[in-house]
Regions:
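Compact, glycine-rich, soluble single-domain proteins
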Residues: 7-60
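C-terminal structural segments of small proteins and small subunits
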Residues: 55-90
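Intrinsic-disorder/low-complexity, polar/charged segments enriched in Ser/Thr/Lys/Arg/Asp/Glu/Gln
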Residues: 1-5, 63
Length: 90
């Protein structure tokens, strides 16, 4: 399992569009991918579920952890984190 911590940087947080982008990217990988809200010390949720991600209420500045476990875990974490760090183009 590979994990990386980072912050949500886009002004509007992970609302419907960025959550959907994250899910589409996560679904390209065979590995199980999760996202966890570190500020509220919540359990990790499935990064392949828009509903689960949006339910976390991830706003700008929220510390999160992206993790993946499986055959392509390294690439999954790298690409998912790059997407979050890009601010989803916002």
């Amino acid at each position: 399992m590979i994990k990386k911590q980072l912050k949500v940087i886009n002004k509007t947080g992970l609302h419907a569009r960025p959550a959907s982008e994250l899910v589409l990217k996560a679904k390209k990988f065979e590995s199980k991918a999760t996202i966890r809200n570190l500020d509220q010390d919540k359990e990790a949720v499935n990064a392949k579920s828009v509903v689960r991600i949006m339910a976390e209420g991830l706003k700008q500045g929220t510390r999160i952890e992206i993790a993946a476990d499986g055959s392509d875990e390294e690439n999954a974490v790298e690409e998912l984190c790059a997407l979050v760090e890009s601010g989803f183009g916002e």
